[in-house]
Each structure stands twice: as C-alpha cells, then as structure tokens.
Amino acid sequence: MEAAAVTVTRSATRRRRRQLQGLAAPEARTQEEQEDQEPRPRRRRPGRSIRDGEEETVFREVVSFSPDPLPVRYYDKDTTKPISFYLSSLEELLAWKPRLEDGFNVALEPLACRQPPLSSQRPRTLLCHDMMGGYLDDRFIQGSVVQTPYAFYHWQCIDVFVYFSHHTVTIPPVGWTNTAHRHGVCVLGTFITEWNEGGRLCEAFLAGDERSYQAVADRLVQITQFFRFDGWLINIENSLSLAAVGNMPPFLRYLTTQLHRQVPGGLVLWYDSVVQSGQLKWQDELNQHNRVFFDSCDGFFTNYNWREEHLERMLGQAGERRADVYVGVDVFARGNVVGGRFDTDKSLFTARDSDNRMRGVPEDNGTARPQPVRAQLLPPCPCSSADRFSRALFWRACGTMGVMPSSPQSLELIRKHGFSVALFAPGWVYECLEKKDFFQNQDKFWGRLERYLPTHSICSLPFVTSFCLGMGARRVCYGQEEAVGPWYHLSAQEIQPLFGEHRLGGDGRGWVRTHCCLEDAWHGGSSLLVRGVIPPEVGNVAVRLFSLQAPVPPKIYLSMVYKLEGPTDVTVALELTTGDAGSCHIGGISVLNAETSSRHSLRPLRVPPTKLARWVGRCGRQLSGGWVQHCYEVSLRGCLLLDLLVCFSRPPGSREEESFTCRLGEIQVVDAASLLAPLPQVQAVTISHIRWQPSASEREGPPALLQLSCTLHWSFLLSQVRCFRIHCWGGMSDDSPGRELPRPEMPMFLGLAFATQYRIVDLLVEAAGPGQDRRMEFLVEPVPKEGFRVPQAEWGRAVLLYSAPA
C-alpha cells in the first residue's frame, strides 16, 4: 500500500525511526519517545505532489477511482474506519510487530494518579467485561452512529477493568483504555486458550524449553507497552501435559517480572481453571491444587460456583495477600452460584460506612446518612440454568425475555472475609433487559452494590469534566450545537461523578438524586442531572460529586457551568473540602466562609482575572441555551483538595418544601499558572491513504459530488492535550445527512481524535470540472488538558488541491 507524499524535517524523520526501533526493543524507549506518537507515511504515491508554505502544506491529487485497499486488521472493510483488533493464534501473536496503522489504537490517556494506589491491600473491585463476543460498537476507534449503545460510568467503584473475549489474544479497544485510565482504573487484556485447539497451542509454547514461553511473554509485554494498557488475565481452559503444566509457573513468573519492568503498575492475573496436575478442573477457590499459579503472578480470579466454606478455607491459603484473590461473581447467575443479577450484592459484605460514597449534607441538621435504594423486585429470569453453557446461547435466550430478575446476596460474603471481587459480565443489564430502560436499570444495579464497593480518589490537576458519557443524540460544543443524530465514542467519555439517590432528614421527605441525562448538554452529548427536595427543616443540601486527594498549587481557578430548570428560587454554589487543616491556609476574594476547618463555600468572581481573561471571558455571564457559568479563584498553601460538592440553598425567608432540578454542564479545577503557559503548536500535518468514490446517488454518469476518504497525521506533545478536534473547510460529512454546508466563516467539525492521526471517511465534496482545481482544507485543533479552546490561528492545517484526470 502506497502512502501520500509528505514533507517532514530530517530531525522528525530520525525521531520516528528511533521510535520504531524503540518499539521493537521496549527497554530502550525513553519517556519522550513514549509520549510522542507521530506515525508518518514513508513513500510518495505516483501522481501526487506537494508544496510548502509558511503556515500550511499543500497536497495535489488527481482524482482516481482505482482501489487502494487498506489492511483489514486495522480498518473496517466496509467503511475504512479504523478499528481495534484481536489476535487469533499463536502465530499471529509471535508475528506481531508495530505498524503505522497501530497508532490509532494506542491509548492517549496515561493511568491517572489515584488514592489509595492499586498496590494497597484494600480489597479491590474488578470488572470483567464480556459482552456478546466482544469488539462490537466499541471497536470503532473514532466512534460510530449507534442508537442505544452500552455505557459504563460507575468508574469510581472500580479498580481493575478486564476486556474479555474468546479470541486468543484480546487487546482492549483503545476507547476502554482511555476512559478507564482517565478514572484511575487499570486495564487488562485476556490471553485465553480453549478446547483441543487451545491444548495444541499450549503444547507449542509450553512443552519445550524456556525460549518458547519467553518469546510469548515478551510479545505480550511488548503489546501491553505499545498500546499502553496495563496487563493480562491468563485463562487456560484446556488440559495441559505434564511438561506444559510444569512450565506454566515459570512462564507466569517471567511474564510478571518483564511486565513490571516495562509497565509500571502492570498486573498479571490467573483464572481458576487448570490445576497443578494439568487437569482442567475448576476449584472455585484458591487451594493447594492451584496455589502454585497464584504464587507466580499478581493475583487469582476464582471460578463462580463457590460457597462460604470456600471463602473460609481461602483465608489460610491467601495469608497477607487476601486483596490479591478476586472472588468471581457471575452477574448472569449461571450455575450453582451465590447472588447474581439484582441479587449480586448478596455476595458482598463490608462494614464500611456509606458516608465514603456520595452523601447529602443538610447544613441545619448535620450529616444525613444516605439510605440504600429500594428497587421493585420481580421474578427471576426464566432463562437461567444450572448448566455451564455458552454465553452466546444464554444471551439469545435472555435477550428475548424482557423479564427483570429479583433483588440483592453474594458480594456481602466476599467483603465479610476481606477478599477482592471480580464482577463478571455486568453488561447483563444491557443484554437481557429493555434497552429503553438501560440507564434506569444500570443505576439500580450499581446502586444496590455501592455500599460494598470502596471508591478511589483522583489525585492530580487539572480536573475537568463535562459529564459527557461518550455518546448522545446530538453533539454540542460549549453550548453550540454541532451535529444532530446519535453518536458513540468511548474515548470521549469524561470523568464521571458519584451517582446515587439519598434521603435527607429524619422523616425521609427530603431527597437528592443524581443521574446522567442525554436530553441536553453543554459540551459533548450529555450532562449531569441533579434533582431533589429540600425539606422545611433543612436550609441547604450539599451533594458530593467527586472524591479527590489532589495536592494543589498556590492559586487555583475553578469554574462551574449549570442551568436550573423550571420555576425555582433555589440557588446553586460550588463547594470544596480541604485536608491538612492544621497547616492549610486559604485566601482570596472568592472565599465566602469556612464553617468547619475543612469545608468551604466559594463566592463567584464578577469579572475574570485580567491575566486569564483570554481563557475565562464568559465568567458570570448568561450563556446560550440558558446555561450560566460561575468562576472562582482561590489562593491555597499547604492544602490537599479532597471533595467537590454542589450546594443547593433555599431562598431567604422560605419555610416550605423546595424542589429543584439542576443540570450540570461542566466543572473545572486548574492551576491558574498553567493557563499562562504557552501551548505547543500542531505541526507537520500530512494527508495520506486517499480514496475517492462517486457519491452514492450519482453512480452513473459524471458525478457532481465525490466521497473523499483520507488519513491525517500530525506532530504534537501528547502529554499536554486532552484530544484533538478535526475540522475542514468545504465538504459535508456523510454521517450527518441532514446538515447544511457550513457558512464560509465556519469550518465544519468532523470528529475527535485521541491520537496524532485521524481517518476521514466518506466526506462529500464537489467534483472538479475539466481544468479545475478544487480545494479542501483540513484543520487540527488541540484541546489542552485545562479544557479551553485554542484560537484558530494556532491550529494545524493542511490543504488538498484535487483535479479531474486529464
């Protein structure tokens, strides 16, 4: 496959060559090379020419309808959209080497700093995502058009995310890695062998000498490091010969050691399947028959048919490593299991106080402890079975029932004994229940578990979220509608808050509930809806949205975008809590009061600080669509930022019950000094892999419209960017058939990129007439970590001039 012509400096070419060499030898890569992903086409396609200007590179192209096939592993064969992929055999694994196309699938987001760290001995929560074979809508790296996609957003309850499928090497789709990392959750792929074919595969790399299994381990580590996820679940679902099972512990030890060297915080987990004799014999516990595998890696994932006596026996086997034992809970409740479905919480137990979750705080009457959500219970799903059977068959059976099973049993027992938990296939609420009720069922399911799931805190700034789920019925950019129609883009999901419903006051008349909502958005496709009733005896209610443990710089800038819906006189304010109260000093005009040594209400700025006016010029103004932005500037010294809360207060003189509905569109907490630092510019934008097709409506005769597909590449320091917004002048995206051509002064938004490359697919453009040149300009807008917009003059750009064949 030939690539478009490019112009890059010699230094950039040398840097790319060093990077590819580093991928072949991971231990030689520097941190700078790890952060600077800039794939480049290397050869000139015949018939193309370029010229350089001071501000843009111009590419010339003669339209041709000749096929230019792309490798099907990396691109969808029907649309040429980039896709995430898996490896199906040992041969594919050993033959894998990084290619330029792999750059689409490399995670942009590093694993966010969190407290407590994953290495702590607090019991953890693992989510094993197994849905209908995997690689569904989530495989489209740049997003897709989906009416009712699956979404997971209770990230603060989760410590480890495993992407599971029945392919030999399951590489997590990059959207899951980006989203999980943003929330401080580590991501594992799956290495699985099954049936007779799996037995032959294991014999091929385990029955020989150490070089064979070390080659497999080295390749798994290289894949982990290149795609920037965090490790592997090893699942051997077939019997092993004595020679092969004898080499399994050394293989696990070597894999774990090498992964720890190359991927800080990396994890290797073993699934309870094979025993040390080589038999495939699920134990449902850690015991003397499988302990050797646990001792050779980072953790043990038990099978699901355990009873409390299994947990009691494991206490002695696990010793001080109880948190490294992940007790499996099948949410589908297949087999002879404890809990499952809406009974899943019965397998967990802990004495931990629900005050570590989201709480309501009525200021007049102290702290109101939240009450668990009490869901309506219905009969068990009739498609359940005590047999071990195919997930696909189960899904087909249960997916047609539409019956909601019964209430919470199994997590209770796991927490009682101090073990970690592995929730298998919680997508049950999506697969087996009505799609139209998905969000209600998702919140119900996780709401019943929340008191058993310790949360973790994000501990770094900047902290910015628009509450976007990475999906929506339309796409909005800072209050301005960009496109109408359903969309789904996993990498675009932003940091999600603590969710729940809680009762306030002694008689329970007051309540507050938070949930995500696709009906309106400030930025992205969704917002956070907070509804509640302030009872007469309560003055105001503070809703804790985020748990943080972030050291803060001397001065921070905060912003909140919100709108109140319906007639109400309730007021809204942003609050924060700080730690290290003995040495923490807070100052600045925005601090209104400090009722305790650590909780602070903030007074909005009337005008933005002069130095920050370029970024925060909307402060205190009514925005489009009824949104309001409040800005704050706070001076701090020796402080730790612990919580972000939103406070709802009754109007002065009110003695009645006050109800409110508030939509939160964005919250920002950034180092004020970082807003003054210059942002690097997007450089070396190139165009390659161009494909032309006649418009679908004009397959016969000379077309007036063409469909253009091409790939953009550019250079940028990834550590300073959240994502890139891709635009063009002149053209109409085929994904939005009802959208008019943009006004000349407005470039058209095409999509989001979370890498330094982007595939444009089926963009409608005017055909060039005889002797004519048509012009398309592509623009790459960097979105800085702080979340503000960059002036258009600082975007990267490249021009495509195309003409009809002579």
Model segments located where?
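Conserved aromatic anchor
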Residues: 705-720
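Extracellular fibronectin type III
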Residues: 785-805
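Extra-cytoplasmic beta-strand recognition segments
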Residues: 161, 528, 542-574, 628-636, ...
